[in-house]
Amino acid sequence: MQKMTIKEAENVLKEIMNEEDDRFQLLMKDERKGVQKLVLKWYKQKELEQKEKENFFEMSKYENALREKGVTYIAGIDEVGRGPLAGPVVTAAVVLPEDFYIPGLNDSKKLSEAKRERFYDEIKVQAIAIGVGIVSPQVIDDINIYQATKQAMLDAVANLSCTPQHLLIDAMKLPTPIPQTSIIKGDAKSISISAASIIAKVTRDRMMKELGEKYPEYGFEQHMGYGTKQHLEAIEVHGVLDEHRKSFAPIKDMIQK
């Protein structure tokens, strides 16, 4: 039997699901370095897929425990943008179906922008309901960032198309009669909170990129409103905008000068 070309071997390996496949056994016996590299790559890919699968099911334990008690609509809630000097705080509430599965799902801060965007689209398709809450810098200055974050989370829940029976929240307690569980570092421990963190992060990043187009000298599309050297220098040169949080240092100090 004629040997496959390296390219053919690469394409065949994409189709092979397990080592028992006759084609895989054939490639295992192929001594060409190029083929052996592809086989090794296949093993590493399968190992990664298995780890992602295990991690996903570990992150589903809160949801599974609630479903065993008959709870169907579970909303994961997370926020993005508590620390920046500019822009809103954005929260998301996401209700996922029982058969939801996106391997590699994690805290949005640990994912590349490309992966966040891809997961964002997949979550939008698969989710039962998504609600977003956005609180402006002006309100943040009026009621403080902690209260503004709570308000944004309550808004996100109110904007859901269904009423959740239980809330899984990343390190917060909300003044609502809906039963809730607060989970420290929940965006890495719950698939619902992780999905919410991705929706919130992509939503806010897109808003900050729009601000970057409106005020190109500030570079919002690069630092997303955080207090980087570039951002602070831009404020010194061009001044404080309406989009800046006047109650946050060093903006507060700059205004008082």
UniProtKB/Swiss-Prot annotation:
UniProt keyword Manganese, yes or no: yes
Keywords: Cytoplasm, Endonuclease, Hydrolase, Manganese, Metal-binding, Nuclease
Annotated RNase H type-2 domain residues: 72-257
Subcellular location(s) per record: Cytoplasm
Binding site for a divalent metal cation: 78-79, 170
GO molecular function ontology, one term from the record: manganese ion binding
Major subcellular location class: cytoplasm
An annotated GO BP: DNA replication, removal of RNA primer
Chemical reaction(s) catalysed: Endonucleolytic cleavage to 5'-phosphomonoester
Family annotation (Pfam families): RNase_HII
Methyltransferase in keyword set: no
UniProt-listed Enzyme Commission number(s): 3.1.26.4
Superkingdom of origin: Bacteria
InterPro entries for the chain: RNase_HII, RNase_HII/HIII, RNase_HII/HIII_dom, RNaseH-like_sf, RNaseH_sf
Co-factor(s): Mn(2+); Mg(2+)
GO cellular-component term (any): cytoplasm
Annotated PANTHER family: RIBONUCLEASE H2 SUBUNIT A, RIBONUCLEASE HII
Function of the protein: Endonuclease that specifically degrades the RNA of RNA-DNA hybrids.
Family annotation (HAMAP family): RNase_HII_B
The name this protein goes by in its record: Ribonuclease HII
